[in-house]
């Protein structure tokens, strides 16, 4: 699509030179817009050739130092975080990485260097003449500019050159990428100029264009027009949580609280998870008002975080603390702390909710797992119904197990040892404790080879119940069935974090119960395991969710520089205590 610059506001006004606003943090703005637009067209596929800004470099350098410090302690068993601690998976992946493969990535080079200042027509002609790429020069340059968040003035000089060469015509793609830069640099007046052109030329836009305009308009006195754009999106699809989040923040910025809450309820009604920065905005706004109804809604947000096992970031946690401490007459006091292994808060001494499921929760989860995971069907095409039936009969013929072992997984935990020897070492030590053991394996483990000694596997079978599935079968359905069928006391050993099984559960409550059960039942062998002594990492005794106990709140939060996977939980907490009771 194309449009003519002439006819829509004067060219001098459109390309006026304004000093742009202070650059926002690249880590928050860039990924959002590239993802939002990338779903429509692959506009931002070219990798940057210029260095990232110094703030980003400093952040990456800090992260690198943090990881190096964490890896220096890998030999110390006492310093290991628990298996589900935030950042633990990242550390394990670093440990398992091959250092010979690191540092050999080839830099991506383009045939032109992005300009750092606006160019005139002759300079753009020369740059295009030097361009050797197969792609369109104009598309390549504007994509590079968007990826590197270049100056709006430089991008403006590109579009002015294109317009001069094409009788005032600039392609839609160039315009939208220019809009991206205007939004990123918070050039509100430029956003409005582009908005006027698009509104006059097009009856509707693709979702990426709407997303950019909404985010760009919310900071202006024309922010309500972002709500009209949201309505345009609703005509063809459910707006994204980012679209809703931006409109909510616009309403709060302009003190329209009712609109903000209405949009929030609409977002929740679509079963969308609100962006955490949107929830943070509600707390930031709340510290300036004294309204019990508003306060109740903020407490509902905390319960929403609990029910959906969501964790605020560090900045959000500070906003929550500030809001609590700003409530007049309540004398809330917050502190950032940790939870001891016993489950006691290091700040206030209160005991956090236990990780163990109640009998009712356990039976509910067991029924769901049996129905949606074990008998789910399609996601386990490699496991036949006949084999599952054979396994069920086998389990029912055995006494309840104390520990279920993923045999192949455990055998491969220690690369220096023979696999059958590794498995035998673990089984032998557990058997000495008179535990009922089940080893799950594959049939190839029974065929003698350099890794699987016949005599060692015979010793395994003497000390534990064993079930060997077909070589193409999935292990996990068997492991889950045997563990849950044996009762709430039964634990299991595997390095697999069972992400896929959690994901296939039907609702947030079941997924949360599954993760809670997993944290309380999955045993992780220490990295420093010696064949003569088997040691497990401690299992968390407490549940890592937002929780309220009388006159206190405990809120786990994500640290800024810790990369947490979806199967991990934060290790830092916000502890809030109230010195005076609620008024009657």
UniProtKB/Swiss-Prot annotation:
<keyword id="KW-0540">Nuclease</keyword>
<feature type="binding site">
    <location>
        <position position="348"/>
    </location>
    <ligand>
        <name>Zn(2+)</name>
    </ligand>
</feature>
<protein>
    <recommendedName>
        <fullName>Mitochondrial ribonuclease P catalytic subunit</fullName>
        <ecNumber>3.1.26.5</ecNumber>
    </recommendedName>
</protein>
<dbReference type="GO" id="GO:0005654">
    <property type="term" value="C:nucleoplasm"/>
</dbReference>
<feature type="binding site">
    <location>
        <position position="554"/>
    </location>
    <ligand>
        <name>Zn(2+)</name>
    </ligand>
</feature>
<keyword id="KW-0819">tRNA processing</keyword>
<dbReference type="GO" id="GO:0042645">
    <property type="term" value="C:mitochondrial nucleoid"/>
</dbReference>
<dbReference type="InterPro" id="IPR011990">
    <property type="entry name" value="TPR-like_helical_dom_sf"/>
</dbReference>
<keyword id="KW-0464">Manganese</keyword>
<dbReference type="GO" id="GO:0046872">
    <property type="term" value="F:metal ion binding"/>
</dbReference>
<keyword id="KW-0809">Transit peptide</keyword>
<dbReference type="GO" id="GO:0030678">
    <property type="term" value="C:mitochondrial ribonuclease P complex"/>
</dbReference>
<dbReference type="GO" id="GO:0004526">
    <property type="term" value="F:ribonuclease P activity"/>
</dbReference>
<feature type="binding site">
    <location>
        <position position="476"/>
    </location>
    <ligand>
        <name>Mg(2+) 2</name>
    </ligand>
</feature>
<dbReference type="InterPro" id="IPR033495">
    <property type="entry name" value="MRPP3_PIN_dom"/>
</dbReference>
<keyword id="KW-0378">Hydrolase</keyword>
<feature type="binding site">
    <location>
        <position position="406"/>
    </location>
    <ligand>
        <name>Mg(2+) 1</name>
    </ligand>
</feature>
<dbReference type="InterPro" id="IPR031595">
    <property type="entry name" value="PRORP_C"/>
</dbReference>
<comment type="subunit">
    <text>Catalytic component of mitochondrial ribonuclease P, a complex composed of TRMT10C/MRPP1, HSD17B10/MRPP2 and PRORP/MRPP3.</text>
</comment>
<feature type="domain" description="PRORP">
    <location>
        <begin position="339"/>
        <end position="575"/>
    </location>
</feature>
<feature type="transit peptide" description="Mitochondrion">
    <location>
        <begin position="1"/>
        <end position="43"/>
    </location>
</feature>
<comment type="function">
    <text>Catalytic ribonuclease component of mitochondrial ribonuclease P, a complex composed of TRMT10C/MRPP1, HSD17B10/MRPP2 and PRORP, which cleaves tRNA molecules in their 5'-ends. The presence of TRMT10C/MRPP1, HSD17B10/MRPP2 is required to catalyze tRNA molecules in their 5'-ends.</text>
</comment>
<feature type="binding site">
    <location>
        <position position="345"/>
    </location>
    <ligand>
        <name>Zn(2+)</name>
    </ligand>
</feature>
<keyword id="KW-0862">Zinc</keyword>
<feature type="binding site">
    <location>
        <position position="575"/>
    </location>
    <ligand>
        <name>Zn(2+)</name>
    </ligand>
</feature>
<keyword id="KW-0479">Metal-binding</keyword>
<dbReference type="Pfam" id="PF16953">
    <property type="entry name" value="PRORP"/>
</dbReference>
<feature type="binding site">
    <location>
        <position position="496"/>
    </location>
    <ligand>
        <name>Mg(2+) 2</name>
    </ligand>
</feature>
<keyword id="KW-0496">Mitochondrion</keyword>
<dbReference type="GO" id="GO:0005739">
    <property type="term" value="C:mitochondrion"/>
</dbReference>
<dbReference type="GO" id="GO:0097745">
    <property type="term" value="P:mitochondrial tRNA 5'-end processing"/>
</dbReference>
<comment type="similarity">
    <text>Belongs to the PPR family. P subfamily.</text>
</comment>
<keyword id="KW-0460">Magnesium</keyword>
<feature type="binding site">
    <location>
        <position position="475"/>
    </location>
    <ligand>
        <name>Mg(2+) 1</name>
    </ligand>
</feature>
């Amino acid at each position: 699509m194309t449009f003519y610059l002439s006819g829509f506001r004067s060219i001098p006004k459109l390309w006026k030179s304004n000093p742009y606003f202070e650059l926002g943090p690249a880590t928050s703005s860039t990924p959002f817009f590239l993802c939002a637009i990338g779903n429509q067209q692959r506009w931002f596929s070219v990798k940057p050739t210029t260095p990232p800004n110094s703030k980003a470099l400093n952040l990456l350098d800090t992260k690198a130092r943090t990881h190096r410090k964490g890896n220096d302690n890998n030999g110390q068993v006492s310093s290991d975080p628990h298996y589900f601690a935030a950042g633990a998976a990242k550390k394990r992946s670093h440990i398992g990485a091959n250092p010979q493969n690191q540092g050999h990535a080839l830099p991506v080079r383009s045939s032109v260097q992005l300009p750092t200042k606006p160019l005139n027509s002759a300079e753009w002609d020369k740059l295009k003449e030097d361009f050797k790429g197969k792609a369109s020069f104009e598309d390549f340059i504007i994509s590079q500019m968007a990826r590197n968040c270049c100056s709006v003035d430089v991008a403006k000089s590109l579009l002015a050159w294109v317009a001069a060469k094409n009788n005032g015509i600039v392609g839609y793609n160039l315009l939208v990428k220019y809009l991206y830069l205007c939004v990123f640099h918070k050039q509100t007046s430029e956003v409005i100029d582009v908005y006027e052109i698009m509104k006059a030329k097009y009856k509707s836009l693709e979702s990426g264009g709407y997303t950019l305009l909404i985010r760009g308009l919310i900071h202006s006195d024309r922010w309500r027009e972002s709500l009209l754009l949201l309505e345009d999106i609703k005509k063809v699809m459910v707006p994204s949580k980012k679209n809703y989040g931006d409109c909510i923040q616009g309403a709060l910025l302009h003190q329209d609280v009712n609109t903000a809450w209405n949009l929030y309820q609409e977002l929740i009604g679509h079963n969308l998870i609100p962006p955490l920065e949107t929830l943070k905005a509600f707390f930031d706004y709340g510290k300036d008002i004294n309204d019990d109804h508003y306060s109740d809604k903020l407490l509902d947000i905390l319960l929403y975080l609990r029910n959906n096992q969501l964790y605020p970031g560090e900045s959000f946690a500070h906003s929550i603390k500030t809001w609590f401490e700003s409530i007049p007459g309540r004398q809330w006091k917050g502190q950032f702390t940790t939870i001891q292994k016993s489950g006691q808060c290091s700040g206030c001494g209160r005991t956090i909710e236990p990780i163990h499921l109640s009998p009712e929760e356990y039976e509910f989860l067991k029924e769901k797992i049996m129905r949606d995971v074990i008998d789910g069907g399609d996601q386990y095409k490699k496991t036949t119904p006949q084999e599952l039936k054979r396994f069920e009969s086998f389990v029912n013929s055995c006494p309840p197990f104390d520990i279920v072992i993923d045999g192949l997984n455990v055998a491969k935990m220690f690369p220096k040892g023979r696999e059958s020897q590794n498995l035998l070492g673990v089984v032998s030590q557990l058997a000495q404790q008179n535990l009922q053991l089940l080893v799950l394996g594959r049939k190839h483990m029974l065929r003698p080879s350099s890794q699987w000694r016949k005599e060692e596997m015979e010793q395994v079978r003497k000390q534990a119940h064993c079930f060997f599935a077909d070589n193409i079968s999935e292990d996990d359905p068997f492991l889950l069935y045997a563990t849950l069928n044996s009762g709430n006391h039964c634990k299991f050993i595997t390095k697999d974090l069972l992400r896929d099984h959690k994901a296939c559960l039907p609702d947030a409550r079941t997924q949360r119960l599954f993760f809670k059960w997993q944290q309380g039942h999955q045993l992780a062998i220490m990295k420093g395991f010696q064949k003569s002594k088997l040691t497990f990492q401690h299992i968390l005794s407490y549940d890592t969710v937002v929780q309220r106990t009388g006159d206190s709140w405990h809120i786990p939060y994500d640290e800024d520089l810790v990369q947490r996977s979806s199967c991990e939980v934060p290790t830092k907490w916000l502890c809030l205590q109230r010195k005076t009771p609620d008024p009657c």
